Amino acid sequence: MAEFVRATIFGTTFEITSRYTELQPVGMGAFGLVCAARDQLTGAPVAVKKIMKPFSTPVLSKRTYRELKLLKHLGHENIICLSDIFISPLEDIYSVTELLGTDLHRLLTSRPLEKQFIQYFLYQILRGLKYVHSAGVVHRDLKPSNILINENCDLKICGFGLARVQDPQMTGYVSTRYYRAPEIMLTWQKYDVEVDIWSAGCIFAEMLDGKPLFPGKDHVNQFSIITELLGTPPDDVIETICSENTLRFVKSLPKRERQPLTSRFKNADPEAVDLLERMLVFDPKKRIRAGEALAHEYLAPYHDPTDEPEAQEKFDWSFNDADLPVDTWRIMMYSEILDFHNIDQSEDAGQVLVEGVGDGQQAFAA
């Protein structure tokens, strides 16, 4: 049975197994607190994320289950890797991943990026997206703060909590809005993997220019800024808008011509601008795919078709439309944790799952 140790960080109780020491806070988000720590078992630095109140509502329970199941399924060099997960006696969930020194947001606010770094970072983002998309997963919340980087410039995508969910009206954060594809922002239609290509294009533009490409104050202003650069959406794209209010708004905007990106990115290589043009296209069906982008001339120094793998199997989304009570999500989550630790879900283990609280939970700790 694992021994748990408590510490108070930012006024929050952090309750982890004694395997992890030297806790240092590195980030706080709407859904959790992240601390750097030392793994006593391996000696490696790790990131420990406390998912706060995962069972407080069915929506949060489902979100936590989705992120956990995704991290278990996805295994790729450019995707954050889950190394441990456990439930504390206070019934909080803690996930442990490798620790990378910084993220792209911090990097972009500290200094301009040189060409070779921009190329290498974009290559790794697209390499990760090719794998994720082949698994039938849409990240949907790609932004610089969800792109982790270490001192060797190795890059890993994180933040899969919102992956492939219909817009829950909780995504008005400024940092997220800047990278949002127009088809999500204005809920035009069902969306697919192309939304991540748009986000990657916005991130690419920010790496080239040193500042966000579309810094809208709200969704209306955001869309207006997009049309100032990319012009009015084509008629066949406008016709896909289902909402009458959205359709009225789009048609009320003044007609604008697409501006050549070469005038906006005067110091960028022509190959870089060409790739960006192919990523920032209003019509999702005409946006370049991740695999195609990897083969673009701009990324030739890094492109290796023999080392850009796809997922071996699709992710199982059968749970995603389920409307279940908290207790059911809790049992499903416990089952996933037992599976992660290769614990036989015998009759005894099942009894522990049903109990769900108290000392029995410590059996799930690594």
UniProtKB/Swiss-Prot annotation:
Occurrences of domain Protein kinase (ranges): 20-299
Keyword Transferase: yes
Compartments it resides in: Cytoplasm; Nucleus
Reactions catalysed according to its record: L-seryl-[protein] + ATP = O-phospho-L-seryl-[protein] + ADP + H(+); L-threonyl-[protein] + ATP = O-phospho-L-threonyl-[protein] + ADP + H(+)
Activity regulation text: Activated by tyrosine and threonine phosphorylation.
Phosphothreonine: residues carrying this PTM: T171
Entry PTM: Dually phosphorylated on Thr-171 and Tyr-173, which activates the enzyme.
Residues where Phosphotyrosine is found: Y173
Keyword Ribonucleoprotein: no
Cofactor(s) annotated in UniProt: Mg(2+)
Catalytic activity, EC: 2.7.11.24
InterPro entries, per database record: Kinase-like_dom_sf, MAP_kinase, MAP_kinase_CS, MAPK_p38-like, MAPK_Sty1/Hog1, Prot_kinase_dom, Protein_kinase_ATP_BS, Ser/Thr_kinase_AS
GO annotation, biological process: stress-activated MAPK cascade
Main location as per UniProt: cytoplasm
GO molecular function: ATP binding; MAP kinase activity; protein serine kinase activity
Keyword set, alphabetical order: Activator, ATP-binding, Cytoplasm, Kinase, Nucleotide-binding, Nucleus, Phosphoprotein, Serine/threonine-protein kinase, Transcription, Transcription regulation, Transferase
GO CC entries: cytoplasm; nucleus
Residues that coordinate or bind ATP: V26, G27, M28, G29, A30, F31, G32, L33, V34, K49
Recorded domain comment: The TXY motif contains the threonine and tyrosine residues whose phosphorylation activates the MAP kinases.
Functional description taken from the UniProt entry: Proline-directed serine/threonine-protein kinase involved in a signal transduction pathway that is activated by changes in the osmolarity of the extracellular environment. Controls osmotic regulation of transcription of target genes.
Family classification: Belongs to the protein kinase superfamily. Ser/Thr protein kinase family. MAP kinase subfamily. HOG1 sub-subfamily.
Classification via PANTHER family: MITOGEN-ACTIVATED PROTEIN KINASE
Name the UniProt record assigns to this protein: Mitogen-activated protein kinase hog1
Organism this protein belongs to: Aspergillus glaucus (Eurotium herbariorum)
Gene: hog1
